Amino acid sequence: MTSRIRFLMCPPDHYDVDYVINPWMEGNIHKSSRDRAVEQWQGLYQILKEHAIVDLVTPQKGWPDLVFTANAGLVLGDNVVLSRFLHKERQGEEPYFKEWFEGNGYTVYELPKDLPFEGAGDALLDREGRWLWAGYGFRSELDSHPYLAKWLDIEVLSLRLIDERFYHLDTCFCPLANGYLLYYPGAFDSYSNRLIEMRVAPEKRIAIAEADAVNFACNTVNVESIVIMNKASDALKQSLTGVGFQVLETPLTEFLKAGGAAKCLTLRVTEPVRDEVHANVYVESRIIRIEGHLLDSGLINRALDMIVDTGGSFQVLNFNLGEQRQSTSAAEVKVSAPSHEVMEEIISLLIDLGAVDLPQDERDAKLEPVIQDGVAPDDFYVSTIYPTEVRINGQWIKVENQRMDGAIAITQTPNGLLAQCKILRDLKAGEQVIVDVLGIRTIRKTESREQRNTQEFSFMSGGVSSERRVELVVEQVAWELRKIRDAGGKVVVTAGPVVIHTGGGEHLSRLIREGYVQALLGGNAIAVHDIEQNMMGTSLGVDMKRGVAVRGGHRHHLKVINTIRRHGSIAKGVESGIIRSGVMYECVRNQIPFVLAGSIRDDGPLPDTQMDLIKAQEEYAKHLEGAEMILMLSSMLHSIGVGNMTPAGVKMVCVDINPAVVTKLSDRGSIESVGVVTDVGLFLSLLTQQLDKLTSPYVSKVG
């Protein structure tokens, strides 16, 4: 027997499932057998006594979970951090555990009352004593980890739990002797799994399957080469014996009903201290402020959910609620993250929501030089669609050329510092680029409940009068088109060939002819099939009047391409009279600029199609400047490209029959975006009908 190893247990005299505080308890209230629980506990107790010393804490009536002594606290040397239970059903256990620790000569540290930490259930020492694995996500708070590092003088590695079945770290994670680790990867987020893989060599990691995990195979007591558990599959037992462990199974099914097994029923109270190991914690905290219609728009919920979903935790320090419906609210939130990497990701997302530092915490943005043309520093800040300002030398500077997925470059000009979004290929050596997430803020429009609730419209979806809902969107779009046209504004259309295939070409042609469109962006295909329809009456070989395939029609588009190539351009085809109507005809006749961006699948292509991708992107960006509205008509590829080039504030209408496409295009966080799930030909037909109701015939000033 290894007499120096000691464990603390509590007899199950008052054990029962009296309430539900984890998924395992659901359906098991008062369904546990006291006699069987005592028998199973005694089985574990006797096995453990053969390999270690076992101390007992006195059971207390009214506290059925006192039997799970792993949650008493966390012991290292002569120090113990007492648990702060999340649920009131267990908070009454704290004084009894504190009394036992103090009576046995331990120095007891107590966390603030509002900071949950559930002891060795959520904090497991590496069996070599090198560091402490600390879990968070369901019971213990991430903010408790710096206290553990300070009081126990040890490096703390934070792991986020994401499967509610494994609500404590010890239900899915068990450090073993000789540097081995038994764990269930599915219980952790990707960052935590990566951290585990960085710290534990592949040959030392024993990853278990879900079938073993739900039998609490990781809730194991390890005494040197002995592992004591509820149950293990033959494959798991073979893995453990293969690396030198002796597996001892003892049934603990009565305790599984409350969400615990062998490890939960024990607390190791002799944990040696390594003198060369000292405190190190990677948890970062930062206080942010967010303002707006936080409640009725759901903004505060989105911000807090975003923090948790990205791997952080939060504490709302102050919340000032607007006094009236039109008043805005403000909140100060402490954000914590397990590492700087995760903190950067969280803050980047919060910046998109309009979060800012407290005035006293404002700092200049961090800059790093571009070393190689077209290559940003590794940690560069990725720009978004929202108007952005960066803090340089104590001054906030507006970022020019706002767009998604760029870097923010800082250059000195005769008129002062210039901050502008640049795509990576345009970066030049010597420029300074914003890195990290300090000194960055976005300027967001105040968002109300009404705006959030009218984001996306579906045609023929569930609900009452869904067709009417699409008509309502069409009415709004028509009204906006009319207003922009009459004010001399700019509307850009990006369209795919489906517009032609669905019979929408004549309606789009009319929009161009009547002055509602100031630029057309698309690919080779929309022009090819538009011209095919107007020269040969087919689109992709289908007769547009009868809706049937024409014999040999699959060759029509190639003949059209060949004809236009012979003339040299679409404009020359119009001038020669071979193109007499259609979308491209109206663009040429009304001097509406168009850009056709090529792709690897293009036939021909048409002579007007820009096959240089970089030039095509530049031409797209040029024609998007000054746009007030963009109609994205059934072209996911080109529409996504346009969306990435477009700053917030531009109204976007995304139309596609595929809901996934609409969601992808419209869900960019812009409150000006509207998604319409419907047939694009039908949408354009409804749109022109609605415009007829709003306006008198329009006479073109050109031609």
UniProtKB/Swiss-Prot annotation:
Signal sequence residues: none
Record region (Arginine dihydrolase): 10-269
Record's note on what induces expression: Expressed at higher levels in vegetative cells than in heterocysts.
MF terms in GO: hydrolase activity; lyase activity; nucleotide binding
Alphabetic keyword roster: Hydrolase, Lyase, NAD, Nucleotide-binding
Result for mutant: residue 65 to A: Shows residual arginine dihydrolase activity
Recorded consequence of changing residue 118 to A: Loss of arginine dihydrolase activity
Official protein name in the record: Bifunctional arginine dihydrolase/ornithine cyclodeaminase AgrE
Protein's organism: Nostoc sp. (strain PCC 7120 / SAG 25.82 / UTEX 2576)
Gene assigned in the entry: agrE
